[in-house]
Amino acid sequence: MADVIITRQSIQALILDMDGVLWRGSEAIGDLKAVFDEIGRASWKVFFATNNATRTIRQYVELLSTFGIHAQSWQVINSATAVTYYLRQQYPHGGPVYIVGEEGLIEACAEAGFYHSENGAVAVIAGMDRQVTYEKLKIATLLIRAGVQFIGTNPDVTYPTPSGLVPGAGSILAAITAATGVDPVIAGKPKPTMYQIALERLKILPENALVIGDRPETDIAGAQQIGCRTALVLSGVTNSQQAALWQPAPDIIANDLASVIQLLVSE
């Protein structure tokens, strides 16, 4: 749907978002087995980077496997990874943090030395939480109003499902901001941290990585900041009219992941 200004030979690795690129909820987007067979024939390295921190890395590896995609844990990161990267820089000795989030975020923090507690919390960390309660929001609000740092996983206000767009992490953050007047420090995309981690693990330069995502203001913006090539797919939260307005324009705009791969292999 857009002029392709990159070639198959210039790309060494694909960095893929998941929600809206690989699947919507529990439904695969297209024939993922065929897509990844084509990726394998092209000999591209593959990495997965999602802003969704609800699952652990182990759970994401297992989920990918159910769709016929085989990945190792080093190939997968989420915004919880970026949160712990930031926390280690700010609080190298670890400590208590109050978490509004799900298992993926809580476990990642614990593994990094930050345990979930409101007592003496050095930070409030919030992300997507499908079990959010008034009590959780109240505690987070009181801590932030008392001067505790507010950190958000990612600003995505919606999340693509087969039923349509539903509230995402950004909606939780917005509620806390409304009650405190404090904007969170965002750790995940569009901050480039997740992509920097991916490039380090892949051992490649930014210009040799193609980032494929469905949300321009996070997936594409973060990649563009550090010089990665970008492909915006219309299988998630963005339609063609919205895609056409995004500046700077992605290198590729396509209907879905399969279309991106087909454009590249036909070059």
Q: What kind of feature is each model-predicted range?
A:
Residues 2-18, 23-44, 53-77, 84-267:
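Asp-based, Mg2+/Mn2+-dependent phosphohydrolase catalytic module
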